[in-house]
């Protein structure tokens, strides 16, 4: 039977972890000085006035490499706990992890063949 009072610690943690950031934003908004002017709108480059436009466009290749990095970073996050408890989990979890790695290998081969990993 589901009893709500069994989760008192969870609800307290959830409320506290939600209230603290909200309070931090509110307090910083109230205490921060309000200053507007052309100095605040200009870019700062080591004390020197910037030459040219401050906004630069990045090539899409940076984002592709970042996306591939995130995929393999998430793979590491999922495989590390599995590797630490490999001897306890058994054969079925080994097969599941093997399928997971094979799917990632297929994805990386696909990205490689599509040219997402080429720097040109």
UniProtKB/Swiss-Prot annotation:
The chain crosses the membrane at residues 9-29, 64-84, 88-108. It comes from the Eukaryota. One of its GO terms (molecular function) is quinone binding. The keyword Ribonucleoprotein does not apply. It catalyses: a plastoquinone + NADH + (n+1) H(+)(in) = a plastoquinol + NAD(+) + n H(+)(out); a plastoquinone + NADPH + (n+1) H(+)(in) = a plastoquinol + NADP(+) + n H(+)(out). Pfam families: Oxidored_q4. Its EC number is 7.1.1.-. Keywords: Chloroplast, Membrane, NAD, NADP, Plastid, Plastoquinone, Quinone, Thylakoid, Translocase, Transmembrane, Transmembrane helix, Transport. The keyword Thylakoid applies. Gene3D superfamilies: NADH:ubiquinone/plastoquinone oxidoreductase, chain 3. Its main location: plastid. One of its GO terms (biological process) is photosynthesis, light reaction. NDH is composed of at least 16 different subunits, 5 of which are encoded in the nucleus. Belongs to the complex I subunit 3 family. NDH shuttles electrons from NAD(P)H:plastoquinone, via FMN and iron-sulfur (Fe-S) centers, to quinones in the photosynthetic chain and possibly in a chloroplast respiratory chain. The immediate electron acceptor for the enzyme in this species is believed to be plastoquinone. Couples the redox reaction to proton translocation, and thus conserves the redox energy in a proton gradient. This is NAD(P)H-quinone oxidoreductase subunit 3, chloroplastic. It comes from Manihot esculenta (Cassava).
């Amino acid at each position: 039977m589901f009893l709500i009072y069994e989760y008192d610690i969870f609800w307290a943690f959830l409320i506290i972890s939600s209230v603290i950031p909200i309070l931090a934003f509110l307090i910083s908004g109230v205490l921060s000085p309000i200053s507007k002017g052309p100095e605040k709108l200009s870019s700062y480059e080591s004390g020197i006035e910037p030459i040219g436009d401050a906004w630069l466009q990045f090539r899409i290749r940076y984002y592709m490499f970042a996306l591939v990095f995130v995929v393999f970073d998430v793979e590491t996050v999922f495989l590390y706990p599995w590797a630490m408890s490999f001897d306890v989990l058994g054969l079925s979890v080994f097969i599941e992890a093997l399928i997971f790695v094979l799917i990632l290998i297929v994805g990386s081969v696909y990205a490689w063949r599509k040219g997402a990993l080429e720097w040109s």
